[in-house]
Swiss-Prot record:
Protein name in UniProt: Non-specific lipid transfer protein GPI-anchored 8
Secretion signal, residue range per the UniProt entry: 1-23
A single Gene Ontology CC term: plasma membrane
High-level lineage: Eukaryota, Viridiplantae, Streptophyta, Embryophyta, Tracheophyta
Species this chain originates from: Arabidopsis thaliana
Assigned protein family: Belongs to the plant LTP family.
Superkingdom, natural source: Eukaryota
UniProt cross-references to InterPro entries, sorted A to Z: Bifun_inhib/LTP/seed_sf, Bifunc_inhib/LTP/seed_store, LTSS
Gene for this chain: LTPG8
Chain residues in the propeptide: 125-152
Record keywords, A-Z: Cell membrane, Disulfide bond, Glycoprotein, GPI-anchor, Lipoprotein, Membrane, Signal
Glycosylated residues, chain numbering: 108
Location(s), subcellular: Cell membrane
Membrane topology of the entry: Lipid-anchor; GPI-anchor
Lipid-attached positions, GPI-anchor amidated serine: 124
Length: 152
């Protein structure tokens, strides 16, 4: 009976850990997808020499001014950018074509979602902390159940 309980606890711990890691990974990818979706109106203007229209530039301005972490997250997932036939360099070129000032070094900071690394306006609406808190809550409740299972 003891070995069954130990195996049950170990299995539960492994499952909870994998759920936590998956939640953190997919949270990051979801934010990158959200940002890449905002870049889609700019796709036809990637290789053209004419300036992009407001349909492209307005979402880009919003990202650059209020959600820099979104752009940085998209830059960390080049496969998602390739979906639009876009590279980091092309995205920066579009920002320049729209007359948007963007400092690429902001994304080189250790944690681009931290308030110290971003301008104050860029931290509003940041969903990284919510996703991390969700993963921690899953872990806390999961380990509570494991502990309760060991007692019973």
């Amino acid at each position: 009976m003891n070995i069954t309980r130990i195996l049950g606890v170990v299995t539960t711990v492994v499952i909870l850990y994998s759920v936590q890691v998956t939640a953190q990974f997919f949270g990051d990818v979801q934010q990158a997808m959200r940002c890449v979706a905002k870049l889609m109106p700019c796709q036809p203007y990637i290789h053209l020499s004419i300036p992009p229209p407001p349909l492209c530039c307005n979402p880009m301005k919003q990202i650059a001014e209020k959600d820099v972490s979104c752009l940085c997250t998209a830059f960390k997932h080049p496969d998602l950018l390739r979906f639009l036939a876009l590279t980091k360099e092309n995205a920066i070129k579009i920002l320049d074509s729209c007359g948007i000032n963007h400092d690429p070094s902001v994304c080189n900071k250790t944690n681009p979602s931290s308030p110290a690394a971003l301008p104050e306006a860029a931290t509003s609406g940041n969903s990284f902390s919510t996703k991390k808190n969700t993963a921690l809550a899953i872990t806390f409740f999961g380990f509570s159940f494991v502990f309760l299972g060991m007692i019973i």
